[in-house]
C-alpha cells in the first residue's frame, strides 16, 4: 500500500505519522518533493512548500517510515536540482529512493511549451550522471518491459567506520548479466538465483519494503557483500518514470481491456 501525498498533514501531525508507521512493512509514503527553490514550487505547486516538505521528512525520519521522494521535472525549472535532491535523499534515514517523473502534458498544465520545457527520460538520465558522483551510466538500467518509459538503479547504503558509503548494485553484478541472461562471473554456482532476485528487484511492481526478502536472498548470493547486518533500510532506488501524453503517446503500450484504463491513457 502506498500513500501519495503532498506531506502537509504529515508535517503538522506527528501522531498521524506514528499511526501510518504502524502499517509497515507493507506500506510506504510517496512524497511530492520537486524542488528546494521557492520560485519553482510556486510555479509547479502554487505555494512555497519548502518548510512543509522538510518538516514532513523530519517526522517520517522519527519513525523510519519508508518514503519515496517524487520529483516532477520540467526543463528550465528544476532539472539542475537533480543531484542536490539525490544527495539530500541519501542522507535521510526514512528515504528509500527517488522517483523522477518528467512533466506529463495533461490536466492543469497551461501554456506549456513542449519545445523548451518537456524533458525526456534520456535527458533525466544524463542529468543524474552529470550531477551525482555516485552513479555511472552502467548503474542506470532501462527496464526491459518498457525501456522508453522506465529506467532504474539500485544502491546499497553500506555502513563504514566513518559513516556510510553508497555503492550501486552494479558494482557486484553487471547490467549485462541482469538483462541478457548471461551467466554470472561472480558466483557461478548461484547465477540463476542472482538473476532471479535482481529481476524481481528491478520490477516496478516491487516496493522497496516488499523487496526485503529478495534483497536478503541476493546478499547471500554475493560473497563480496557482508549482508548479515544489512536490511531493506540499506537499499536505495532511483526510478525515472515517463508517463505518456499526447506528444509521446504509444498506442501499443495501453491495455485493450475496457475495464482497466491505465492513467496515461485516461489523462491523454
What are these model-derived regions, one by one?
Residues 1-102:
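Radical SAM/AdoMet-radical enzyme domain recognition
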Residues 44, 62-238:
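Radical SAM enzyme [4Fe-4S]-AdoMet core and its adjacent flexible, acidic
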Residues 37, 51, 149-151, 245-254:
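Low-complexity, compositionally biased segments
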Residues 12, 105-108, 251, 256:
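Generic structural "secondary-structure junction" signal
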Residues 215-268:
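C-terminal target-recognition/interaction regions appended to catalytic cores
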Amino acid at each position: 500500500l502506498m500513500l501519495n501525498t503532498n506531506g502537509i498533514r504529515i508535517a503538522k501531525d506527528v501522531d498521524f505519522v506514528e499511526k501510518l508507521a504502524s502499517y509497515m512493512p507493507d506500506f510506504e509514503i510517496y512524497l511530492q518533493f520537486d524542488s528546494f527553490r521557492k520560485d519553482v514550487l510556486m510555479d509547479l505547486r502554487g505555494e512555497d512548500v519548502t518548510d512543509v516538505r522538510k518538516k514532513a521528512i523530519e517526522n517520517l525520519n522519527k519513525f523510519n517510515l519508508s518514503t519515496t521522494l517524487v520529483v516532477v521535472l520540467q526543463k528550465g525549472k528544476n532539472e539542475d536540482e537533480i543531484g542536490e535532491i539525490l544527495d539530500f535523499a541519501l542522507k535521510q534515514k526514512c528515504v528509500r529512493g527517488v522517483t523522477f517523473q518528467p512533466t506529463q502534458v495533461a490536466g492543469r498544465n497551461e501554456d506549456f511549451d513542449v519545445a523548451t520545457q518537456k524533458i525526456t527520460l534520456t535527458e533525466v538520465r544524463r542529468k543524474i550522471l552529470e550531477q551525482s558522483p555516485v552513479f555511472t551510466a552502467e548503474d542506470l538500467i532501462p527496464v526491459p518491459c518498457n525501456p522508453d518509459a522506465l529506467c532504474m538503479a539500485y544502491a546499497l547504503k553500506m555502513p563504514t567506520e566513518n559513516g556510510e558509503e553508497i555503492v550501486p548494485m552494479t558494482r557486484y553484478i553487471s547490467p549485462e548479466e541482469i538483462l541478457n541472461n548471461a551467466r554470472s562471473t561472480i558466483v557461478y554456482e548461484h547465477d540463476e538465483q542472482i538473476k532471479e532476485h535482481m529481476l524481481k528487484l528491478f520490477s516496478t511492481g516491487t516496493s522497496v519494503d516488499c523487496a526485503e526478502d529478495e534483497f536478503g536472498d541476493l546478499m547471500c548470493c554475493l560473497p563480496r557483500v557482508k549482508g548479515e547486518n544489512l536490511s531493506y533500510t540499506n537499499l536505495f532506488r532511483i526510478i525515472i518514470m515517463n508517463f505518456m501524453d499526447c506528444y509521446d503517446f504509444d498506442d501499443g503500450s495501453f491495455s485493450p481491456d475496457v475495464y482497466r484504463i491505465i492513467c496515461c491513457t485516461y489523462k491523454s
